[in-house]
């Protein structure tokens, strides 16, 4: 894996220093980002709200140009602000609150995307909309996906599927690949991990299957939380039931986001949890492979 971080939230996409009104706080009121971030002081509140509702303006946390992480090839991954889940292992807790994003015009983001078309073509890459939760801003996501497809660029979304109802068929027609994060295979574990219900994710995956949308299943392996063989087998059975699934990624838990939780004054409940052993990771992948799933 190689990555070139371009959208550092400290400069090009300034992450507000404190939550509040959308895009307010820190340097966000004083500086525009290289994606055309809009200083809130320069935009009447009603215009900001109208822009959000129409999808002309989105709340963006950051972006990066990265290879072999969020889909095939080199990709421009844009992290939208706001998420309804509260995953215990989230390594970007600063994306949970939509108010911590910077207002960015869809047209400005598309202009940035267009600049990388030659890289995308050369590497078989494209764009990935992530978060946060991309489907918390469906109007903005819809505009970006439609614009990218008009440019001939491969598109992907990274989503929990919890807000799958926000994605209409027209939006999904502009999505080439869905990275579907299935946090657990049983309701009790899923609620413990995310604070939300599992069923919306399962329903969204089945809808993707009906539409024939290529899907990669992502599963985070956390010792003592999601590593129980029974719950892993349920995730594997679910993935195997979807003909649209072309790949499964078992992602070992890490504590890279722990400092962010502390900075935000949030309780990080996995402070004493170690990453899974290589043996546990491999045995978990074997469960998926035993069902004929291409697994990494």
Where are these regions (language model features)?
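Auxiliary Fe-S-binding modules of radical SAM enzymes
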Residues: 1-67, 223-296
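Generic detector of short, locally flexible boundary/turn motifs and exposed helical patches
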Residues: 16-28, 40-46, 53-55, 75, ...
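Solvent-exposed alpha-helices and their adjacent loops that cap or buttress functional pockets
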Residues: 52-53, 69-71, 121, 171-172
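Canonical Radical SAM [4Fe-4S] cluster-binding loop centered on the CxxxCxxC motif
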Residues: 55, 62-104
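Short glycine-enriched, charge-decorated loop/helix-capping segments at active-site entrances
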Residues: 94-98, 191-197, 265-273
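Short, conserved loop/turn and helix-capping segments at secondary-structure boundaries
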Residues: 103, 195-198, 275-278
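Conserved AdoMet/S-adenosylmethionine-binding subsite of the radical SAM
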Residues: 110, 114-263
């Amino acid at each position: 894996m190689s990555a070139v971080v371009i959208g550092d939230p400290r400069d090009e996409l300034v992450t507000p220093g404190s939550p509040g009104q959308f895009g307010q706080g820190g340097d966000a009121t004083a500086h525009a980002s290289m994606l055309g971030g809009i200083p809130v002081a320069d935009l009447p509140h009603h215009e900001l709200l109208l822009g959000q509702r129409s999808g002309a303006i989105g709340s963006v946390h950051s972006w990066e140009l990265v290879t072999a992480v969020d889909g095939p090839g080199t990709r421009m991954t844009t992290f939208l602000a706001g998420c309804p889940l509260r995953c215990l292992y989230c390594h970007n807790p600063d994306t949970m609150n939509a108010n911590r994003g910077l207002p960015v015009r869809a047209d400005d983001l598309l202009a940035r995307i267009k600049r990388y078309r030659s890289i995308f073509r050369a590497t078989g890459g494209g764009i990935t909309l992530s978060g946060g939760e991309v489907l918390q801003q469906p109007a903005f996501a819809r505009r970006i996906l439609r614009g990218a497809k008009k440019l001939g660029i491969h598109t992907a979304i990274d989503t929990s599927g919890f807000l799958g109802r926000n994605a209409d068929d027209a939006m999904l027609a502009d999505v080439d690949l869905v990275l579907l994060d299935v946090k657990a295979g049983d309701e009790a574990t899923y609620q413990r991990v995310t604070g939300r219900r599992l069923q919306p994710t399962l329903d969204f995956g089945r809808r993707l299957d009906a539409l024939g949308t290529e899907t990669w299943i992502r599963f985070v392996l956390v010792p003592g939380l999601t590593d129980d063989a029974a719950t892993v087998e349920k995730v594997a059975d679910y993935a195997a039931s979807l003909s649209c699934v072309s790949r499964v990624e078992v992602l070992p838990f890490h504590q890279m986001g722990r400092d962010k939780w502390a900075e935000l004054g949030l309780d990080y409940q996995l402070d004493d949890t170690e990453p899974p052993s290589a043996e546990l990771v491999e045995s978990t992948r074997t469960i998926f492979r035993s069902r004929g799933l291409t697994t990494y």
